[in-house]
Amino acid sequence: MSLSSLDAVLSLIATSSTLDQDSAKVPQCQVCKRKFANQKTLRTHMKHITCRPGRSNVVNHKFRCENCEKQFTNKPNLKRHQITHSGSKSKKCSTCQRTFFREDQLQRHLHNHLKERSHFDCPVLNCSMQFVFYEGVENHLVNHHHFSYSESAPCGKCHKLFGSPRHLLVHYHFDHKEALRSSAPAPTSSARLSPITVSTSGSPRAQLAISPQEKPPQKLSINLGTSPMIEEFCEQNSATLPNTDQQLSPTLSPNEPRFRNLITSEPTPSFECKHCTIKFHDATMSIMHNALHAPGSPFKCAICGAECGNKIVFTMHIITASHDFGGIGT
């Protein structure tokens, strides 16, 4: 054997030995014998239920998909997966009409819709708490009603049990609240505008009663009281204020021309709040609204001094908080 041939053989042996050493260092799952590029991907793979330490017996009982060769630990999971191969998306979102293969995919999608809303009711029986943000009602269920993600949560309307507060909230607001809205008759034009009673008596209390959608509209009774801030505002704007004795009746009736115009036409607004851009067709309503803004801090409540931050939080605070309107400006 020539010297050059001997060198070629030794080089081949060294290369083969190096390849054997490199292959021995390749990360490999000891359960399913699958190889990975690095230890990080191997650790991620080992978290899978079929390849966790101590679960090697599961490998011998895998259920394999005939379409894509994926394997599952039980038959229900295999059937759930096979729905994606059927090509039929039978689950439809009632909000955006998007379709899905499986119920769990639809539930995750509805949860995203739910978090975009700005009004949430507590789904617990005999609890009337309402929230502006999704995080508020979810924390309320966990902290106040002591629901957890490891125990079933019951629906206050149909008493069904759900695996988490999130699933309960999706069920309650889409299955019950949406069904209630769709079954309710469309309100007439006169029902959309609740009767408004405006009183200029010296009562120290102003009451705002906003009827929920499930109930017929109620009267919105507002007393101006004897607040120094309102009196000062009235004096400064006396030239633009209507004569309440002649032009403002105690109760607006749908038969009155001014009320009928609100229904049949779109009049040009005369008064607008410079802070929250709410427009009014009546100077008295504009006065009452402007008196709620604290001087120098537009989103601070002039009644109780609460700092609200923006116009949405400010509006919800005025509607839901218990206030003594007679103390405005004092």
Swiss-Prot record:
Source organism superkingdom: Eukaryota
Phenotype reported upon loss of the gene: RNAi-mediated knockdown does not cause defects in somatic gonad development. RNAi-mediated knockdown in a ehn-3 rd2 mutant background enhances the defects in gonadal development in the ehn-3 single mutant.
SUPFAM superfamilies, alphabetized: beta-beta-alpha zinc fingers
Keywords for the protein's UniProt record, in alphabetical order: Metal-binding, Repeat, Zinc, Zinc-finger
ZnF (C2H2-type) intervals: 27-48, 63-85, 91-113, 120-144, 153-176, 271-293
Tissue: Expressed in the somatic gonad.
UniProt-recorded Gene Ontology molecular function terms: DNA-binding transcription factor activity; RNA polymerase II cis-regulatory region sequence-specific DNA binding; zinc ion binding
InterPro entries xrefs: Znf_C2H2_sf (IPR036236), Znf_C2H2_type (IPR013087)
Region (Disordered): 183-203
One BP annotation, GO: regulation of transcription by RNA polymerase II
Low complexity composition-biased segments: 183-195
Function statement: Together with ehn-3, may play a role in gonadogenesis.
Family to which the UniProt record says this protein belongs: Belongs to the krueppel C2H2-type zinc-finger protein family.
Name of the protein in its database record: Zinc finger protein sdz-12
Species of the source: Caenorhabditis elegans
Lineage: Eukaryota, Metazoa, Ecdysozoa, Nematoda, Chromadorea
Gene field: sdz-12
